[in-house]
Amino acid sequence: MIKQRTLKQSIKVTGVGLHSGNKVTLTLRPAMANTGVIYCRTDLNPPVTFPANANAVRDTMLCTCLVNEEGVRISTVEHLNAALAGLGIDNVIIEVDAPEIPIMDGSASPFIYLLLDAGIEEQNAAKKFIRIKQKVRVEDGDKWAEFTPYNGFRLDFTIDFEHPAIGKDVRNYVMDFSAQAFVQQISRARTFGFMKDIEYLQSQGLALGGSLDNAIVLDDYRILNEDGLRFKDELVRHKMLDAIGDLYMAGYNIIGDFKAYKSGHGLNNKLLRAVLANQEAWEFVTFDDKQAVPHGYEAPTQVLI
């Protein structure tokens, strides 16, 4: 049986909030089987919890933001959520003493290290997957995203920015998902932004924690980071990272083929909602026989970083 997974022990880290620029303490705790991924703001009294849920995603302008019925929000969850998806962690309590998850270095890599440091433990309950049964597509102008059936989790993402530093040869990335592939090919890809946009955001009191230490920054002609890129196609890889985090808001790893063109947090969430709203388009599956598990979802015994 492919089993659910949680952490062996609690672990804590501090970082900076992307929008506030303030120090944030993040604590990850093990959770019982069938708990799911639960975000919790401990800076509020009483603390407010946000189960990872596609319908709780409201504000997707700059990041993925969960909002509850009272309008309380927690922001910038997508990179941590992607790390949880990458390592197949089903049950975890995520506590943060601020309105946002710390940005760390702008990628999912610090969260991968954190999760592996805590250790991963199998639980005595079957892991549920969402299997795509029929095509679902959403569009917004020339942007689109779709799921089709596939025995695994395949991602094909294309970006389209007219910029001298973003050539046509670095605008598409395709990956067959596995924990190893995610860690090595996707997790280190950092978020990116354009200098003119960042300056405007900071004038509005946003992105105050944004810097060359936690983002790739481009002016009108070039990349400003002295160390350059971690991959020549780091930008599209990061958009794939975002998508993996956004789609894990379902609370379950997905078995299907995901394709996207110029998609972002909003369209990723729109696709996920469209899938879940159509009972004919998906089903829950579990695997008693490990041999029957789709490629990439075999429980990894170890992950090489």
From Swiss-Prot:
Its cofactor is Zn(2+). Pfam families: LpxC (PF03331). Keywords: Hydrolase, Lipid A biosynthesis, Lipid biosynthesis, Lipid metabolism, Metal-binding, Zinc. SUPFAM superfamilies: Ribosomal protein S5 domain 2-like (SSF54211). Zn(2+) binds at residues 79, 238, 242. One of its GO terms (molecular function) is UDP-3-O-acyl-N-acetylglucosamine deacetylase activity. The keyword Ribosomal protein does not apply. Pathway: Glycolipid biosynthesis; lipid IV(A) biosynthesis; lipid IV(A) from (3R)-3-hydroxytetradecanoyl-[acyl-carrier-protein] and UDP-N-acetyl-alpha-D-glucosamine: step 2/6. Its EC number is 3.5.1.108. It comes from the Bacteria. It is an enzyme of class 3 (hydrolase). One of its GO terms (cellular component) is membrane. InterPro entries: Ribosomal_Su5_D2-typ_SF, UDP-acyl_GlcNac_deAcase, UDP-acyl_GlcNac_deAcase_C, UDP-acyl_N-AcGlcN_deAcase_N. It catalyses: a UDP-3-O-[(3R)-3-hydroxyacyl]-N-acetyl-alpha-D-glucosamine + H2O = a UDP-3-O-[(3R)-3-hydroxyacyl]-alpha-D-glucosamine + acetate. The active site is at 265 (proton donor). One of its GO terms (biological process) is lipid A biosynthetic process. Gene3D superfamilies: lpxc deacetylase, domain 1, lpxc deacetylase, domain 2. Catalyzes the hydrolysis of UDP-3-O-myristoyl-N-acetylglucosamine to form UDP-3-O-myristoylglucosamine and acetate, the committed step in lipid A biosynthesis. Belongs to the LpxC family. HAMAP family: LpxC. This is UDP-3-O-acyl-N-acetylglucosamine deacetylase.
